[in-house]
Amino acid sequence: MTQKTKRTLALGLAAAAGVTLLAGLDARLVVRTYAIESEQVSTPVRLAVLTDLHACAYGEGQKNLLDVVAVQSPDLVLLCGDIVDDDPRMPEERALATVEALAEVWPVYYVTGNHEFWTGRVEEVRELLRARGAVVLEGESAAVTAAGQTLRIGGIDDPSVGEDIWREQLETVTAAQDGETFSILLTHRPERVEDYTGRGFDLVLAGHAHGGQWRIPGLINGLIAPNQGLFPQYAGGAYDLGGGTAMIVSRGLARESTQVPRLFNRPEVVVLDILPS
């Protein structure tokens, strides 16, 4: 192989590596769509699930994010925690404005994540979100009508609330189910699956894992996630927990708030269609 050929090959490999890296660092929003069939609904219901915003920016007035949600025409918007951030560099008002804009169009239901607790002002954050139109669930269950269908949405705080309180909240929302209405558990933590199984929920929605931060599609679903460590089992996607319970874990919306950039792991809006079986 001549020196010129070696140089050409090296340049080609470097260019290919650069293109691959740029593709991997793509931080544009993506929509992940899932569908669940149920005998408990007679017409489709569409949910938009947003997690782990961490007060990140999505255009002026959060237009990029809001437009993506609007195009999906959801019946409900569900927020699974870490919408605000404890880092003072991430403006809380941006997160609050996002929730307010969502609540002006759709019913919005919210539970806390660990970062709301890490602000040291979790009760104030809850009240600020209520003032912006979100229904804040802290161990409570609500019968919600959407697209002419009744759903039961139970929401629990992040375990940062304290383990005893967290378990009491979980027991409360479990007991609120009637066995006939499609039931959803809103939680922040996907790794607590053993606590969610066998409770009769049709659907568990969670975030927190940020998609494992780095992904290699087709090889690893995530490199590392909080409270799961290396190669997390519940980094993002759909999971069958058995007993008729499905879990959807959103890879979340965090971008500039993270210390390590996402790799092959675009921030996402989850759209879930509940369809008549």
Q: Which residues are covered by each model-predicted region?
A:
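Short, Asp-centered acidic motifs that coordinate Mg2+ and/or phosphate
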Residues: 75-76, 109, 134-135, 151, ...
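N-terminal membrane-anchoring alpha-helices
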Residues: 1-41
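Short, flexible loop segments at the rims of nucleotide/cofactor-binding pockets, characterized by
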Residues: 26, 53-58, 85-89, 159-163, ...
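Binuclear metal-dependent hydrolase catalytic cores centered on His/Asp/Glu-rich metal-binding motifs
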Residues: 127, 131-134, 146-187, 193-194, ...
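Beta-strand-turn-beta hairpins that frame and shape the catalytic cleft
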Residues: 35-48, 141-155, 178-182, 240-247, ...
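Membrane-embedded segments
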Residues: 43-137
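Active-site metal-binding loops of divalent metal-dependent hydrolases
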Residues: 50-55, 81-83, 114-116, 140-141, ...
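Conserved beta-sheet core of the metallophosphoesterase superfamily
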Residues: 190-270
